[in-house]
């Protein structure tokens, strides 16, 4: 009998792979393995060397050595270890799920898979867990936006009895407070879950596929470890896309990460791009005191209803943000203190340059070709409504796959992946997915635009309500923007909403629920909405399909 200690086994699935390799060796009569005790007990006919056994195990990526411990003597192949130490049979083994990434989609999947009885290994190569949202995305950006909003209110509030004044601010202190809150949320929402859920474990390193059930993880110390799993989720997120502009990569340009955590305010910030992130950061920096110029390849929000981009551009220009539509940089240089951009609208100079032209999936380092996982032209992993790829047992969620790049979509996809991995059945329906851009006024959308509906041969009817007709907006002296509702003309059923309004994001979920429940605008107009609230604007806009709300008294139905 030979006793071996084995490092690297994390679940019964690992046991199965090691046992299969040892059973295949001629002369091995019986193999008993316990991953809890990290050891194997092997009975042979006496003609098998320890070196051969260790070699078979290490070929799978584990570390093995002969154990110095003692074990119960086995006198025949029919003997076995005590039942409490015996390895599980295939029928009752705990399923092992491996997850590449530790963002919102990854953790949502891990929690659901654990609830389904699985053991979960999360694999992360970055220095910190949590992914983009909590670390360098949603959370720090909303803190920055809120601080900038308060600065703007001090500088330019609408009330005649409140004196406007220049805010006294420290960018360094704002960043310090922002970083502290990021660390607090990362600890509460990610690290704490790892520490309190015994079904979850973390492996630090960068993963690549070896086959459909095996990942090779290159750890930070340079060693490699094989991770065998019954199911695998890819949740590797995305990275800022850098356009191929002559000279750009030779300059100290910012991505959103540098912009969010900067210690000083630039005098003049030029923003290449008109992505969601570009618009949010551009306005925040303007409100904190920087001169800001946006270079938009087309127009702002050109993929959305044209009225949204037109009105938001007007709001930006009113705040002093320079928006250059149909403008592209062809060359960028830096002289040590100033950037110079050559564009089709002339040369621009600035002391800081933000490049924010979108993000692309982190998939190129995964060795997806080894297993045949399908990606699209953008490198995004193609998944079905159950979040499964074309390879059975391999799933994907979040920015790395062909879905909208929103953290709540990633989390929903991760949850459904975890359910489907552990024997359940869950689909992700994005037909009423709300989206918000946290500019001020905010842009909020759900469902179809008129153009999208017409492309589907749906005849539409729509109404636009200016925010000056919403009592709460009037009371706030914040009447920029509008609410637009799109209906299927034949039925009056609401199929889309586009909103530009202060706190417009707080309105959009009500519209989403109305669309989800196939409500008509007549039914929506008949609902009770609290007075004075911004969301009452949905009711008022719905009423405009049948009457002129300017002729109604307050709260009139």
From Swiss-Prot:
The cross-references to Gene3D superfamilies, in alphabetical order and at most eight, read: 3.30.390.30, 3.30.70.100, FAD/NAD(P)-binding domain
Q: What does this protein do?
A: Resistance to Hg(2+) in bacteria appears to be governed by a specialized system which includes mercuric reductase. MerA protein is responsible for volatilizing mercury as Hg(0).
Q: Where is the HMA domain?
A: 1-65
Family label: Belongs to the class-I pyridine nucleotide-disulfide oxidoreductase family.
Q: Which residues bind a metal cation?
A: 11, 14
Instruction: Spell out the protein name for this chain.
Output: Mercuric reductase
The Gene Ontology terms for molecular function here are: flavin adenine dinucleotide binding; mercury (II) reductase (NADP+) activity; mercury ion binding; NAD(P)H dehydrogenase (quinone) activity; NADP binding; oxidoreductase activity, acting on a sulfur group of donors, NAD(P) as acceptor
* UniProt keyword list: Disulfide bond, FAD, Flavoprotein, Mercuric resistance, Mercury, Metal-binding, NADP, Oxidoreductase, Plasmid, Redox-active center
């Amino acid at each position: 009998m030979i006793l071996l200690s084995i490092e690297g086994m994390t679940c019964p699935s690992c046991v199965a792979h090691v046992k299969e390799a040892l059973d295949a060796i001629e002369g091995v009569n019986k193999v008993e393995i316990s991953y809890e005790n990290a050891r194997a007990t092997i009975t042979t006919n006496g003609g098998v060397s320890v070196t051969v056994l260790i070699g078979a195990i290490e070929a799978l990526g584990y570390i093995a050595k002969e154990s110095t411990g003692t074990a119960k003597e086995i006198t025949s192949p029919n003997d076995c270890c005590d039942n409490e130490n015996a390895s599980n049979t295939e029928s009752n083994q705990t399923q092992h799920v491996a997850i590449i990434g530790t963002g919102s989609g990854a953790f949502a999947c891990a929690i659901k898979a654990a609830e389904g009885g699985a053991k979960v290994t999360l694999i992360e190569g970055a220095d910190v867990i949590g992914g983009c949202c909590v670390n360098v995305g949603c959370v720090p950006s909303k803190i920055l936006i809120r601080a900038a909003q308060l600065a703007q209110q001090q500088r330019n509030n609408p009330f005649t009895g409140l004196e406007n004044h220049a805010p006294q601010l420290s960018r360094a202190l704002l960043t310090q407070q922002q970083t502290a809150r990021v660390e607090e949320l990362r600890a509460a929402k990610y690290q704490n879950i790892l520490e309190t859920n015994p079904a979850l474990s973390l492996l630090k390193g960068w993963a690549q596929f070896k086959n459909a059930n095996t990942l090779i993880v290159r750890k930070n110390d340079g060693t490699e470890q094989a991770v065998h799993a019954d199911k695998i989720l890819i949740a590797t997120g995305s990275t800022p896309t850098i356009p191929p502009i002559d000279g750009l990569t030779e300059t100290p340009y910012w991505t959103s990460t540098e912009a969010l955590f900067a210690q000083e305010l630039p005098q003049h910030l030029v923003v290449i791009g008109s992505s969601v992130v570009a618009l949010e950061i551009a306005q925040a920096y303007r409100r904190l005191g920087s001169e800001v110029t946006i270079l938009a390849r087309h127009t702002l929000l050109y993929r959305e209803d044209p009225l949204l981009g037109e009105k938001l551009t007007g709001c930006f220009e009113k705040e002093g943000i320079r928006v250059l539509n149909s403008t592209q940089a062809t060359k960028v240089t830096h002289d040590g203190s100033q950037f110079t951009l050559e564009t089709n609208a002339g040369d621009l100079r600035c002391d800081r340059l933000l490049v924010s032209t979108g993000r692309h999936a982190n998939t190129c380092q995964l060795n997806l070709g080894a297993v045949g996982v399908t990606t699209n032209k953008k490198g995004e992993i193609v998944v079905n409504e159950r979040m499964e790829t074309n390879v059975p047992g391999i799933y994907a969620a979040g920015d790395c796959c062909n879905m909208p790049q929103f953290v709540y979509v990633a989390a929903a996809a991760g949850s459904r992946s975890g359910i489907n991995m552990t024997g359940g059945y869950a689909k992700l329906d994005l037909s009423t997915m709300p989206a918000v851009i946290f500019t001020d006024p905010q842009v909020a959308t759900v469902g179809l635009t008129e153009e999208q509906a017409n492309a589907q041969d749906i005849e539409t009817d729509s109404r636009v309500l200016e925010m000056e007709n919403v009592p709460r907006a009037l009371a706030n002296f914040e009447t920029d923007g509008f609410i637009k509702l799109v209906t299927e003309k034949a039925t009056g059923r609401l199929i889309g909403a586009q909103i530009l309004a202060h706190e417009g994001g707080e309105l959009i979920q009500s519209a989403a629920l109305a669309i989800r429940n196939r409500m008509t605008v007549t039914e929506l107009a008949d609902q009770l909405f609290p007075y004075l609230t911004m969301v009452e604007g949905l009711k008022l806009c719905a009423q405009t399909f049948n009457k002129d709300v300017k002729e109604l008294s307050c709260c009139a139905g």
